[in-house]
């Protein structure tokens, strides 16, 4: 059974500059850490949750280690300066999945996300492999059953694989099938796709599903496509697979990208999403601390989470 644990206070440590001025604060001083999972106490806040699971990566023949990412990313976030929006972060702990029960873990995350959103929170989830996206996305669909939900994925991979069981490569096919079962439209956009990393069968599936696809080569000029997608939906779930970044910026993932989309371009693409007033849920997935020798990759990933919380409207 998937277990919930509060985040350790030892993760939220950093440099104390408060002697300089009252507003010389860092995230470890402004994030609220909860000892219980009770989102109803935190309306209008951002639920920071970890999904400590990489069973989907293992099933997808990837490099395991992403289960250790949530706490590594908390440590990287802790010492970053606290600015507007960061005081809304409430650490609601980790969902820890026992191997090999991926399906049970995804259901636990789905229920937790739905509960947070229905309580008036927003969710920022630290994965975990990209299997995180099915649990997270399903929770968003559950919470907004009467509204159109747009799924925006920044990723080198379409993750529309067809297999006999869930993996880190299947979450968006699973979400599409969930939408089919609920007789609702599947709104999915994937930015940063590597044609070299996706078979013709996956491209065909994306075309059949009417997926908005922007290749890595074209992301430097994709703001118009992002805006068009934002405009056509009521609510948005944003998921960032860190392998969308080039290997020289993000080596610490299961499948590093030879080309990728540079961090500055990723930030410019997600800014209008965060400021749209429609973003309800976001996650960072596939970070693997086993391949981060000096913590630099963790800081890259944490900067994305920091920026999302800062821009979130």
Swiss-Prot record:
A Pfam family it matches: Arginase
Catalytic activity, reaction form: N-formimidoyl-L-glutamate + H2O = formamide + L-glutamate
Keyword Secreted: no
Pathway: Amino-acid degradation; L-histidine degradation into L-glutamate; L-glutamate from N-formimidoyl-L-glutamate (hydrolase route): step 1/1
Top-level taxon of origin: Bacteria
E.C. number(s) listed in UniProt: 3.5.3.8
Protein name: Formimidoylglutamase
Species of the source: Salmonella paratyphi C (strain RKS4594)
